[in-house]
Each structure stands twice: as C-alpha cells, then as structure tokens.
Regions:
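Membrane-interface helix-boundary motifs at transmembrane edges
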Residues: 13-19, 52-53, 112-121, 175-187, ...
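Specific transmembrane alpha-helix
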Residues: 1-9, 98-114, 128-184, 215-236, ...
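Membrane-interface helix-loop-helix regions
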Residues: 29-103, 131-149, 154, 215-228
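Helix-boundary and loop/linker segments of multi-pass membrane transporters
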Residues: 13, 58, 82-85, 157, ...
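Alpha-helical transmembrane segments of multi-pass integral membrane proteins
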Residues: 131-134, 168, 193-301
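Hydrophobic alpha-helical transmembrane segments
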Residues: 22, 30, 121-126, 191, ...
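Transmembrane alpha-helical segments and their boundary/interface "anchor" motifs
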Residues: 9-50, 56-72, 105-106, 159, ...
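Transmembrane helix-loop junctions in multipass membrane proteins, especially transporters and channels
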Residues: 10-15, 45-53, 114, 118-121, ...
Length: 313
C-alpha cells in the first residue's frame, strides 16, 4: 500500500488512467507469475515420494493446474485442478495466494481507495484494523494464527481479504502522511527488529484469550508500520540494498516449488532437525538466491522493458 500510493497517487492527476495503471501492474508482476507456474509444474511432475507424488497425477490435471496458476484462477479444494491435495488455491505454487489478493488490492485501490480523502481513509483503516483484530483474537479460522487466505473457503477468503486490505490501506495512509524521521542505520535496525519479531515462538492461549493473535496484531498494527516508516526514512542506498530489493520478488515467487521438493525429502528421509538437514538447506538457500538474481537480470527485467516499450504509454 505504501509503495503503490507513493508511486501512483500523484500520477492520477496528470498522466495515469485505469488502463495505464492495470497495464503497468501486469507488466511489473505477471512475467514472473508465468515463469513460476512453469517451474511449479516441472517440480511437481518430477516429485515422487510419500508426500505429494506428482508422478501419479494425470497430464490433463497438471496442465489445467498450470493454466489456472498462470492466469490466477484459484482452484477449489478437491477440484480436478487442485492436484496436490492440500486444498491450496494454487497447488503448483502455494504462496501465489498472497499475490492473488494483492491483485485484488490493486483493483480496489484503482477503483475506490485512491479516491478517498485522508479522513475517510483513516476511518477505513480503523474499521479494517478492528475487523482483523477481532478475526485474529477470536481465532476465527481455528488456526491459532492469522495464517489464512491460502485456500478457497469462506473463512480463508474473508480472512485473506482482511489480511490484505488493512495493511494495504494503512500503507496508503502512511504514504500520504509520510514525514521522514531522523534515523541512522535504518536497514540494520529494521532487519534486527524483523528477526526479533519472527523469533518469537507461538504464544498459547490464556484464560480463553488467543494471545498469539494479540501478538500478531501488535506486530501488524504497530511494529510493521513503524518498520516501513523507518525504512522509507533512510534516505540512502547502496549495492546491497539494491540487490536485496531486486531479488525480493523473484525469490518470493520461485522459492516454494523448490520447498515442496525439500518438504517431501524431509518426510521420506524422516529428517527434521537442522543438524540433519543443513547440508541440503544451505546449498538450497544459496541456489535460490542466485536463481532469483539471474532470473531478475536475464528474464524479468528484459521482458518488462520490452513490454513497457510496447504497452506502457
């Protein structure tokens, strides 16, 4: 939300229209969606083993799942296209569900949110924050967390919309009211904050209160916006920041097809600790980072430049 509002809000008053906005977003995001779908189909088709044996799935089902993933048509749990059997919207590349909601967020932004005054947007943010907090603290999905949105049922779709709409709207509001703060070493401070937040283990419920939901909402409502503001206030950049920023999207969209193979290997080998798996984890981590960088430089950026020349006015 912060990035979209920062990049596009001023343009609506001058050169940007709805068609131009949607074309720009598709050019930015969808080339890697298409490639990741193919990678997911290939890794699934070669994956044998006890868990998610893709070698036994018919070619027609795999092709249907591939087309659905490429064109962001979510699979209904138990349907022919839901080939992995986990109930995922996009069984060839599970995390695509979050990008699916981001696409919805872009549509809502272009049609509605960008037109709202700061006062109305603030009211929207408060209401969405209250709704997401209630969802999390009441454990509406019975997941003991707000890890919803990945499958196409009522609770997950509604929860996924809340998970996207609140931070998206909050990010827009932060962008509109942004005033840089004085901070040094913002990158490292933000990194340490994120590591500390993610290192907190699951917090069990107490006296009927889902404390894990309370913690998650404290992060989402207070800490994450602060981290965004700190990062945006940094005001400087270097090669490391550019490298990490560049690979972030390719790494996000390609890593999970490989993780499926890794999970299946863990289950087959019955290896569950880092001491038993580090010799696979470390090379896989390095390989994914290198692959993300190579795909950025030799696939994503060239295709986006080509499509921008043809379609973006």
């Amino acid at each position: 939300g912060f990035v979209i509002a920062y990049a596009y809000d001023p343009r609506w008053r001058t050169t940007l229209n709805l068609k131009g906005f949607f074309v720009r977003r598709l050019v930015r995001l969808h080339p890697m969606v298409l490639l990741s779908a193919v990678i997911g189909a290939v890794t699934f088709s070669i994956q044998g083993g006890v868990q998610w044996n893709g070698t036994q799935v018919s070619t027609s089902a795999l092709m249907l799942a591939l087309l659905c993933t490429m064109f962001f048509i979510p699979a209904v749990p138990g349907s022919y296209a839901e080939v992995r059997g986990n109930g995922e919207m996009f069984p060839l590349n599970g995390p695509s569900w979050s990008l699916f909601f981001e696409y919805i967020g872009n549509i809502i932004y272009a049609l509605v949110l960008r037109r709202l005054s700061n006062k109305v947007l603030t009211i929207v943010v408060v209401l969405l924050g209250a709704g997401l907090s209630l969802f999390a603290i009441a454990d509406a999905a019975s997941y003991t967390s707000i890890g919803v949105g990945w499958t196409l049922d009522g609770v997950n779709f509604g929860g996924g919309l809340l998970r996207m709409l609140f931070p998206f709207s909050m990010g827009m509001l932060l962008s509109r009211q942004f005033k840089p703060m004085k901070i040094s070493g913002a990158f490292w401070k933000c990194t340490l904050m994120l590591v500390a937040l993610m290192a907190v283990p699951y917090i069990p419920a107490c006296a009927g209160v889902h404390l894990n939901g309370v913690y998650e909402m404290a992060c989402v409502i207070i800490v994450f916006p602060l981290i965004v503001k700190m990062g945006a206030s940094a005001g400087n950049s270097n090669k490391l920041y550019h490298f990490l920023g560049g690979i972030s999207y390719p790494l996000y969209i390609i890593h999970y097809p490989v993780m499926y193979l890794f999970y299946a290997w863990l289950i087959d080998e019955k290896r569950y600790t880092l001491a038993e798996t580090w010799h696979v984890v470390v090379p896989m981590y390095v390989a994914l980072v290198v692959a993300a960088h190579l795909l950025l430089k030799y696939y994503d950026e060239p295709i986006r430049r080509y499509l921008s020349r043809k379609w973006v006015k």
